[in-house]
Regions:
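N-terminal, positively charged nucleic-acid-binding surface of large information/translation enzymes
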Residues: 1-103
Length: 103
């Protein structure tokens, strides 16, 4: 996030329009396992981590323009619209990906 902030500021100083979007990915087995290890429900675990991440950015004077949580309804709506747009523009016969998401 620090490097992204440096690049954003450099672009702005250089006369370019630049934005920094950051946030937290709050889905997947890693979240479930970490929440279980902490003895917290996944939502509470994510709320805590998201707040820590925001505090860290503030203390480091990182100037993000957008903070996105993958559990936010606005994020879900945008992703849904994106996938619908892709589906509408996809070549005929394009199949669905079925596989493991976690790395």
């Amino acid at each position: 996030m620090v490097l992204a902030d440096v690049i954003k500021r450099w672009k702005q100083i250089s006369g370019h329009e630049a934005y920094l979007a950051t946030g937290t990915d709050e889905h997947g087995m890693k979240i479930q396992q970490a929440a279980l290890k902490e003895g917290l429900p996944p939502k509470e675990f994510c709320d805590n981590n998201s707040n820590k991440f925001k505090d860290l950015a503030e203390h480091a004077n990182i100037s993000h323009d957008f903070f996105i949580r993958t559990t936010d309804q606005e994020h879900k709506d945008v992703v849904q619209q994106f996938w619908l747009l892709l589906k509408a523009r996809a070549p005929e016969g394009l199949g669905l990906y079925k596989g493991k998401h976690e790395g």
